[in-house]
């Protein structure tokens, strides 16, 4: 198994770098051909969502959710905490908070937390969160 950094996935999705994007595509394709599992941890997914949403790329929430779903639905990608990531993507599609916020809530719930306290008003009426 090979771990992936955020910048490889950004280059793969955006094709914005004439040197790095083709290398990212070639690497991911070759790993798929070899059936080499590619590990994507939750920090990478949070950074990916943050980068794609930023000024440089300006992806919509829907486009980001679709990209995250893509990694979940392709067998070559071994996504850390896959079930919680799926739940966070679902909530991100429907809600107003950042993807990372929803993932925090689902990971905390999995760890046995009754709820997650927050100052984030976008999460005030979301299950699993309690306004502080």
Which sequence ranges carry the predicted segments?
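Active-site neighborhoods of divalent-metal-dependent phosphate/nucleic-acid chemistry enzymes
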Residues: 75-115
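Short, well-structured N-terminal submotif of metal-dependent ribonuclease cores
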Residues: 1-40, 56-62
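Acidic, PIN/NYN-like endoribonuclease modules and their adjacent C-terminal/linker elements
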Residues: 1, 105-132
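Histidine- and aromatic-rich ligand-binding microenvironments
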Residues: 5, 39-41, 97-98, 120-121, ...
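Short, conserved alpha-helical segments within structured domains
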Residues: 40-44, 81-84
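Glycine/small-residue-rich phosphate/adenosyl-binding loop
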Residues: 57-72, 76
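A generic structural signal for short hydrophobic patches within well-formed alpha-helices
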Residues: 9, 45, 123-124
